[in-house]
Amino acid sequence: MSTNSTRTPLDHIRNFSIVAHIDHGKSTLADRLIQSTGGLAERDMSEQVLDSMDIERERGITIKAQTVRLHYKANNGETYVLNLIDTPGHVDFAYEVSRSLSACEGSLLVVDASQGVEAQTLANVYQAIDNNHELVTVLNKIDLPAAEPERIKEQIEEVIGIDASDAVMISAKTGLGIPDVLEAIVNRLPPPKSDVGENGPLKALLVDSWYDTYLGVMVLVRVIDGVLTKGQQIRMMGSGAKYGVERVGVLTPKMVNVDSLGPGEIGFITASIKEVADTRVGDTITDDKRPTAQALPGFKPAQPVVFCGLFPVDAADFEDLRAAVGKLRLNDASFSFEMESSAALGFGFRCGFLGLLHLEIIQERLEREFNLDLVATAPSVVYEMTLTDGTEKELHNPADMPDVVKIKEIREPWIKATILTPDEYLGGILKLCQDRRGLQTELTYVGNRAMITYELPLNEVVFDFYDRLKSISKGYASFDYNIIDYREGDLVKMSILVNGDPVDALSMLVHRSAADRRGRGMCEKLKELIPPHMFQIPIQAAIGGKVIARETVRALRKDVTAKCYGGDATRKRKLLDKQKEGKKRMRQFGKVEIPQEAFIAALKMNDE
């Protein structure tokens, strides 16, 4: 379906996003806004229209930013075009959030009236303020018996420092107060600005891109200056690639083709782009023949932060896994992978992710959408090394670590973590951060909740920090982080040896102070899981040549003297010595079978 769009004047456009913590009702509010402006017919409405992936709906999180264009007839009789960009709320997708926010001029800050401000709300609000957004505060879930709107308003003013006296009170579930939200968007959020209008050279921000089976890569753009039309030759300023625009349209949330997009408008284009990796979020799109002089600021390619190996449980599934990661890569440029082989687990891929949630989601999508059974090795972060000959090197896999003699220094990434928690759990959380080599930088109270800021090594967080935090605080603490810098650390490579052979999939880089604890835990876990063989199996954790922990799996033995009735003791001695000799030889040549479950359990080992 195609419409000939007459250009909407700038002062009748509002571009906004919704900023909220997980579960505070962001996607439900988006549904209500779509419904009340007639964006979708009743029969097409589904819960969380904008969360199109199953995982997004089930976990109640938004992963990919989505957009929708709504037409709203305001109380003053004018019709406005509202472009809502739905942003992910999770810390792993912080870069996506910052790009989505830079495409808008204002944000709705949605806070649950019963729960108050959470850590991720803070992180995203600060990003919105960095982008000079006008904020409209919306208190959601005011129909709940536990709602305390007045207390939460005070909390917003104390914690975030913005005036919440004129907050809009709504219940997105029942639809209460939705008209007030629409009026607030029109009256309180600013319209987009354009320096040169539609006659200047094209300048557009690439907000997002995804892969469509029929149309190839679809690119979501926000036009700043100039006009984007069908048939135009465009150029990506970050990569220098050129494309011909085949189709221009808007999402309402259905795709509707239009002839062109002008300043302030948000829509999509397709242009025979082969894969999503060619369209980098945050890049500037311009006309190839008449380019704009300056690209938009703030563009940086997404860098993977956490790495882990993914291996198929059944080696025969390797080709299916190769096809599956290739398909996911089409839709997610921040996910990277390369082939790797492990003596214990066979062939698989070393994959890079933006963070732990990203890793979990990719793994779940591979298992779910492609029916694969996978084993993931222990997650590791990217280390920077300076070698003795002066060269700089990045280390993604602990197994590739060069000889200690060649390393001058190793630097690891550090994060700044903000934790919000009810104060009764404060002691346990401080101890957890202390145990993980954290440096406390701030501790403030807001009512009965504490806000703690810590600097922590990312290496200590990727393992199971989040799970431990949730269990200490019974699920009440919220956590948000961003990477600040790389710092030198006393890091050592810990290898696990089974029967004298190193098991590559279990080697990891640890801080020297935590090596004992980690090594002992790993050996004890493996001792429980490796079944007894006919010979005794030593399990050791070693740093370089020094063994720091050891457990032994006892041998099974046959009673070889059972057939001797009485008689000479030397006869029994001879049989026992012969058995001992056999066991010795067996230990030399025997291979230890480590069951798959042992790997999975050892890698999931909780750092108690």
From Swiss-Prot:
Membrane topology type: Peripheral membrane protein
Biological processes annotated in GO: positive regulation of translation
InterPro entries referenced in this protein's UniProt entry, alphabetically: EF-4 (IPR006297), EFG_III/V (IPR035647), EFG_V-like (IPR000640), EFTu-like_2 (IPR004161), G_TR_CS (IPR031157), LepA_C_sf (IPR038363), LepA_CTD (IPR013842), LepA_IV (IPR035654)
Catalysed reactions listed for this entry: GTP + H2O = GDP + phosphate + H(+)
SUPFAM superfamilies the record matches: EF-G C-terminal domain-like (SSF54980), P-loop containing nucleoside triphosphate hydrolases (SSF52540)
The enzyme's E.C. designation: 3.6.5.n1
Annotated GO MF terms: GTP binding; GTPase activity; guanosine tetraphosphate binding; ribosome binding; translation elongation factor activity
Gene3D superfamilies according to UniProt: 3.30.70.240, Elongation factor 4, C-terminal domain, Elongation Factor G (Translational Gtpase), domain 3, P-loop containing nucleotide triphosphate hydrolases, Translation factors
Family: Belongs to the TRAFAC class translation factor GTPase superfamily. Classic translation factor GTPase family. LepA subfamily.
Protein name as annotated: Elongation factor 4
Species this chain originates from: Agrobacterium fabrum (strain C58 / ATCC 33970)
Lineage per the UniProt record: Bacteria, Pseudomonadati, Pseudomonadota, Alphaproteobacteria, Hyphomicrobiales
